[in-house]
């Protein structure tokens, strides 16, 4: 029921954004400030965010409906629904964040729940082996992601999307220290490594064959 409500609200949000031009970008809470770098909790809802909210909640709703019958006699029925609900929350936090720190926390939460789901049947040695491999592969991706976020924070002094995009022109004029590479290229490569290693072919290859 909760996921159905979330899907309906997401669809209403998409309608407001797409047809009425509504937009939301606010920082709700400042967690801490370290050396002038603000670590905040905030949300950005634009057309891309609204579309992804609908996709996430719709897919989650379909999974919930299918799971009601598929997992009915499994002793881990309630635990599975807890994992899927946490996965949905993590994905929504990821796509709705207005800063890189919150996005990273959502990203890590998605990785954690993926680890738990891969090893859901923990009495099977193959499942445990597969989720450990997924955990290790994810750490490689996280390293690239953290490097990219760290470079952005170091050269822009902010983690907020709006402020970063406002300084994108300045980043484009800089080179990575000790090389002739453009700084923005290095940052994009780091973020790309984080995304591809964690959630595409490498991960599927390393975990899928063990289940």
Q: Model features per residue range: what roles?
A:
Residues 1-209:
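...captures the hydrophobic TM-helix bundle architecture rather than a specific catalytic motif
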